[in-house]
UniProtKB/Swiss-Prot annotation:
One GO cellular component, as annotated: cytosol
GO biological process: protein modification process
Name the UniProt record assigns to this protein: Lipoate-protein ligase A
GO molecular function: ATP binding; lipoate-protein ligase activity; lipoyltransferase activity
Assembly mode: Monomer.
Organism this protein belongs to: Salmonella schwarzengrund (strain CVM19633)
BPL/LPL catalytic domain boundaries: 29-216
Pathway: Protein modification; protein lipoylation via exogenous pathway; protein N(6)-(lipoyl)lysine from lipoate: step 1/2; Protein modification; protein lipoylation via exogenous pathway; protein N(6)-(lipoyl)lysine from lipoate: step 2/2
InterPro entries given in the database record: aa-tRNA-synth_II/BPL/LPL (IPR045864), BPL_LPL_catalytic (IPR004143), Lipoate_ligase_A (IPR023741), Lipoate_protein_ligase_C (IPR019491), LipoylTrfase_LipoateP_Ligase (IPR004562)
Gene3D superfamilies: Bira Bifunctional Protein, Domain 2, CO dehydrogenase flavoprotein, C-terminal domain
Catalysis: reaction(s): L-lysyl-[lipoyl-carrier protein] + (R)-lipoate + ATP = N(6)-[(R)-lipoyl]-L-lysyl-[lipoyl-carrier protein] + AMP + diphosphate + H(+)
Annotated residues for binding of (R)-lipoate: 134
UniProt keyword list: ATP-binding, Cytoplasm, Ligase, Nucleotide-binding
Amino acid sequence: MTTLRLLISDSYDPWFNLAVEECIFRQMPATQRVLFLWRNADTVVIGRAQNPWKECNTRRMEEDNVRLARRSSGGGAVFHDLGNTCFTFMAGKPEYDKTISTHIVLAALNSLGVMADASGRNDLVVKTPDGDRKVSGSAYRETKDRGFHHGTLLLNADLSRLANYLNPDKKKLAAKGITSVRSRVANLTKLLPGITHQQVCQAVTEAFFAHYGERVDAEVISPDKTPDLPNFAETFARQSSWEWNFGQAPAFSHLLDERFTWGGVELHFDVEKGHITRAQVFTDSLNPAPLEALAGRLQGCLYRADKLQETCEALIATFPEQESELRELASWVAGAVR
């Protein structure tokens, strides 16, 4: 009986792909070695312990329909588009060894004519006339009896968009959690013009088979063709939820301030698990009562633009004579946390 399993995703949905990865990892036999190949449409993928409001320009992501996906491994934030090929190697212990999977990826690149080297803990680099450039980054996860190594290969990614989404607005966040390290990167098309996702997948697959001396047929999966994965619906629901992608952020504080024609406003938020645990409001407005009332209402509110806007606008019923000021405030607060 073969010990290998090869899965290739036809879906570009990051939540689907990460849910498949999680389910396979949980239910695979400890004697199995798995290779999962996939790619995501426009997505910022953050590490398990990261703060999306600190790492990402969440406002621009919303404007451009870029998804946020939190993975179950550690490490930093990365931008995925269809110019990235993603790979996941899984194995039970003691078989699991990330140096083996790194060797397989290096062998695949070598078969395509690219000489790359492992650098540090997570990266693969190539030599270019401009110096060493990163073409692959990885992250890892281990449990008591198994582990996985997943990463990306930059084929023809739109590198200009990295800065669009991974450089956040200069919000006044005093955040805990893991900050991403920006790296000098390059696409493999710089060395191999015309290289495709399919060619890279084939090369990685052949290197995987060669290392283990076995071959298996690929299982092609999509939302219409999912293998029998226990608890997949629940895992996908969690992976795609606001509570997981945003609400799992480490605790942080956010200071907002603005001057309106009717007065200056300062808001101080403490946020834990995506909820405001403490809110302070300061103002020099001649009519401070609505803002004083707002502080209490914000306690426990989801740190989400639509919920904050609703909370501010709900005060209009109590303070109708200040409707215009409250609508202006609501619009500003919602925009500031997007």
